[in-house]
């Protein structure tokens, strides 16, 4: 868990925390080690199974739920002091308005959601370039139909890969903020950052703080953003 996120979320000890799209639960369990009572959610059965296995050794009280986040109210009860989601998650969701409704549904009165995500402007850049230059390739505003990306996944057999296709939806910063506001939440802050948690572009350089940045000589542009939005007390 990165220091920036810990600082912006604040004290979590003794508080309930719901981690949406938690993958294998590494960050979820990091919050648990800081004292939070955690529940993680992901749609991937293998990811949830791995998270439960890790929790057995780290925090047996951690709960992991296999569910589509957009249908989560059908699979999970209760409310949480903190709803958390981060690092490459929103692009997998076709409906941000529904996502915001789900987020608001699970926040307890006086609680908040914290989002740390790659910046929509960064997703416009051409990630095929090996040179230290910036070139636009994708639209900033999301389209009704998702973008498709071909990839090759490694297997247990040496030198053998399995081809596949993944799909992603673009969402502007305005869509994200307005979705949360329309769901009845109050935006506390929106911060933009010139770094990102992984190597989005081949030319990026990892610094000592483990954030990836553009190399010297290129313009400084937003690569990530963090947002906190709260539900009014009862």
Predicted regions and their residues:
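Class I SAM-dependent methyltransferase SAM/SAH-binding core
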Residues: 16-72
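Acceptor-substrate binding/catalytic loop of class I
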Residues: 120-132, 159-174
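Conserved class I S-adenosyl-L-methionine
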Residues: 112-154
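Conserved alpha-helix/loop element of class I SAM-dependent methyltransferases that forms part
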Residues: 1-15
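A short acidic, Gly/Pro-enriched loop at the edge of an enzyme's catalytic core
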Residues: 70, 74-83
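A short glycine-rich, Lys/Arg-flanked "PGG" loop and its adjoining helix->strand segment in the class I
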Residues: 97-112
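A short SAM/SAH-binding and catalytic strip from SAM-dependent methyltransferases
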Residues: 81-97
């Amino acid at each position: 868990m990165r220091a920036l996120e810990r600082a912006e979320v604040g004290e979590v000890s003794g508080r309930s925390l719901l981690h949406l799209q938690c993958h294998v639960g590494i960050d979820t369990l990091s919050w648990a080690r800081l004292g939070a009572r955690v529940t993680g959610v992901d749609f991937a059965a293998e990811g949830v199974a791995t998270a439960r296995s890790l929790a057995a050794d780290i925090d047996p009280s951690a709960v992991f739920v296999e569910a589509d986040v957009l249908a989560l109210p059908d699979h999970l009860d209760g409310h949480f002091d903190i709803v958390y989601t981060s690092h490459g998650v929103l692009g997998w969701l076709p409906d941000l308005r529904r996502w915001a409704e789900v987020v608001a549904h699970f926040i307890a009165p006086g609680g908040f959601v914290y989002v740390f995500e790659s910046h929509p402007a960064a997703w416009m850049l051409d990630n095929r370039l090996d040179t230290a230059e910036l070139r636009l390739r994708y639209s900033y505003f999301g389209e009704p139909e998702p973008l498709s990306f071909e990839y090759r996944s490694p297997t247990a057999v040496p030198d053998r890969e399995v081809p596949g296709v993944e799909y992603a939806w673009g969402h502007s910063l305005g869509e994200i903020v307005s979705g949360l506001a329309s769901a009845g939440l109050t935006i506390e802050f929106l911060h933009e950052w010139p770094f990102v948690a992984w190597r989005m572009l081949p030319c990026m350089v990892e610094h000592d703080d483990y954030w990836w940045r553009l190399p010297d000589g290129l313009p400084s542009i937003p690569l990530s953003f963090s947002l906190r939005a709260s539900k009014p007390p009862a």
